Amino acid sequence: MKLLFENWRKFLIKEQSELWGHHITPEQKVFISKTPYTEFRNVQQKKPPHPMIKPQGLWYGCGDAWVAWLRTEQPDWLEESSYLYEVKTDGKIYKVSNDADFEELEFDYGFGGRYGNQSIDWELMQKEGYGGIEICPYNWQRRTDSDWYYGWDVASGCIWDSSS
């Protein structure tokens, strides 16, 4: 985990992916925090009771997607945050970057939830050695076709194991 900038809000230029002179590239994975982020806690995943339950862990955005979403949808969150961090993933992250990957994820880890809606078994993914999931770029079509993905607002990932 690398602190990119502290108290960066005052340097935020609207409608740009450049913050305080630092350009957030599409390859970077970033998250913001109200307080200094000092330690990662592993999170035990559970099989969700319904599709809208996302995995638990440290969430990050791919490129400037999360920051851009916050600007328009939750500007208060952005205003309250003072720290921007870059995440480096070295471990076993399940990566979804296209329709074929998406179908494979649903085939391998999808299960029928209540009312016939499909969920993803985050617990099984963890048991099989994955320390997180990343879906980049964002897939708008899948959002409307897959109930479990509907709550994901941007290209993002979630890490639940510190070795990742």
Where are these regions (language model features)?
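Extended catalytic/binding region for NAD+/ADP-ribose chemistry, centered on the ART fold
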Residues: 44-80
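Active-site and NAD+-binding cores of ADP-ribose-processing enzymes
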Residues: 19-47, 74-164
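Generic detector of well-ordered alpha-helical segments enriched in charged/polar residues
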Residues: 5, 9, 67-71, 103
